[in-house]
Amino acid sequence: MPVPPPPAPPPPPTFALANTEKPTLNKTEQAGRNALLSDISKGKKLKKTVTNDRSAPILDKPKGAGASAGGYGGGGGGGGGGGGGGGGSGGNFGGGGPPGLGGLFQAGMPKLRSTANRDNDSGGSRPPILPPGGRATSAKPFSPPSGPGRFPAPSPGHRSGPPEPPRNRMPPPRPDVGSKPDSLPPPVPNTPRPVPSSLHNRGSPAGLGAPRPPFPGNRGAAFGAGSARQNPSGSSSPFPRPPLPPTPSRALDDKPPPPPPPVGNRPSMHREAVPPPPSQTSKPPVPSTPRPGLGSQAPPPPPPPSRPGPPPLPPASNDEIPRLPQRNLSLTSSAPPLPSPGRSGPLPPPPSERPPPPVRDPPGRSGPLPPPPPINRNGSTARALPATPQLPSRSGMDSPRSGPRPPLPPDRPGAGAPPPPPPSTSVRNGFQDSSCEDEWESRFYFHPISDLPPPEPYVPTTKTYPSKLARNESRSGSNRRERGAPPLPPIPR
């Protein structure tokens, strides 16, 4: 009867399953437990075998790792040296560390020897794999003395063999680099190479061969003598920069002579509005460019001083830096009435009656106006991008320009007659408020104040609030006792 007591713990599930089958379940459980014990014992043995099997692939993996290290090539030399150091440390572990790790490694020792034999067999077939065979050297301390006597000779030979080709591989690009400094300054050749490849796709494929001379030739033809001078300077940055400085410095003269690169860069600047470089470099010319435009189109010089008054203008204009010169060009080249009717078309009817619609119109303007790109982009961006406070400032800018234009002045003085930026918006709001009051007064009838009864005079008196009384009672502790009682029972629980 000693067996039933152990099944005593499991019977509750057996009771839940079936009450009558307890003895049979006990027998099966006994057999199952015996089988489990035997399986557990076998499992331990199997685990030992599994450890041996695992140790074998782990020991084989260094070969695979060695092969992969061999595949790394240039790093194989340093890896081989590191492997040699690891081999020495491995020898130390093999000699002094068997008590700690010896159980696993000693079990795998014969397989290490077999792998060493495999290396002997396949040593000729795997010459490149052996250089990282530095790990074979790491296995050498484990292998018998005869093994290391055999391996060290071939392994150093193999080490010396394969690391040389990676070195040979490494230097050939360096002579290419050396050839690059012949045509370009030595420190920069690597950097300017990618930059021209990004700027000109032709240069990247042709860069390796002799066509390097036409490469600077093309740049010299594109960028001019100044850029040719900057090319020998050898800084990668001047390649993107040369088009930028001539544009602000020479203004509009450079556009016709170097058509391909600067024009390609400028449309990208106009469309992409490349903010970081052009804005920084051209921030000073921005005020200069619009002011000459104003001087050329509108004789009165006062607008520029009024313009610097509102600070938000320069940042907004920075986004449109390249577009401002286009506006001048387009206004000078194309007939001025084009922008005037385009802008005055929607405006004249509403301004006097509806101050809000001019605020709503700019998106409408931006919608219909885009087809004539330069003027309308400037107008749309000038009105859509900047906030409402900038609109009056731009209207102030346009007012001198539109001085000769009859329709515009009546439109914008309505909104721009008051002092320029903030008061104009506030005045617009005032117009809106007044118009709303007019609408309400026209719609509804309001009693005069005289018809309304006078309010009761204010008399300072102490007032009592029942809610405060209840709070005072709760503070007194009457409610605290009631509230304090329930939390106490859960505490003893």
Curated annotation (Swiss-Prot):
Keywords: Actin-binding, Cell projection, Cytoplasm, Cytoplasmic vesicle, Cytoskeleton, Methylation, Phosphoprotein, Repeat. GO terms for biological process: actin filament-based movement; response to other organism. Belongs to the verprolin family. It comes from the Eukaryota. It is found in: Cytoplasmic vesicle; Cytoplasm, Cytoskeleton; Cell projection, Ruffle. InterPro entries: PH-like_dom_sf, WAS/WASL-interacting_domain, WH2_dom. The keyword Membrane does not apply. Residues 32-49 form the WH2 domain. This is WAS/WASL-interacting protein family member 1. CDD domains: WH2_WAS_WASL-1 (cd22076). Pfam families: WH2. Recruited to PIP5K-induced vesicle surfaces in the absence of functional WASL. Residues 67-105 have a biased composition (Gly residues). The modification Omega-N-methylarginine is found at R126, R135. XRSGPXPPXP motif repeats lie at residues 342-351, 364-373, 400-409. The gene is Wipf1. Binds to WAS within the N-terminal region, at a site distinct from the CDC42-binding site. Binds profilin and actin. Binds to WASL. Interacts with DBNL. Interacts with DBNL. Interacts with FNBP1L (via the SH3 domain). The modification Asymmetric dimethylarginine is found at R33. Residues 470-484 have a biased composition (Basic and acidic residues). GO terms for cellular component: actin cytoskeleton; actin filament; cytoplasmic vesicle; ruffle. The modification Phosphoserine is found at S143, S227, S330, S340. Residues 1-14, 142-155, 162-175, 183-195, 239-248, 274-290, 298-315, 336-361, 403-424 have a biased composition (Pro residues). PANTHER family: OS06G0326200 PROTEIN, WAS_WASL-INTERACTING PROTEIN FAMILY MEMBER 1. Residues 45-48 are annotated as: Binds actin. Residues 1-493 are annotated as: Disordered. Residues 21-31, 425-434 have a biased composition (Polar residues). One of its GO terms (molecular function) is SH3 domain binding.
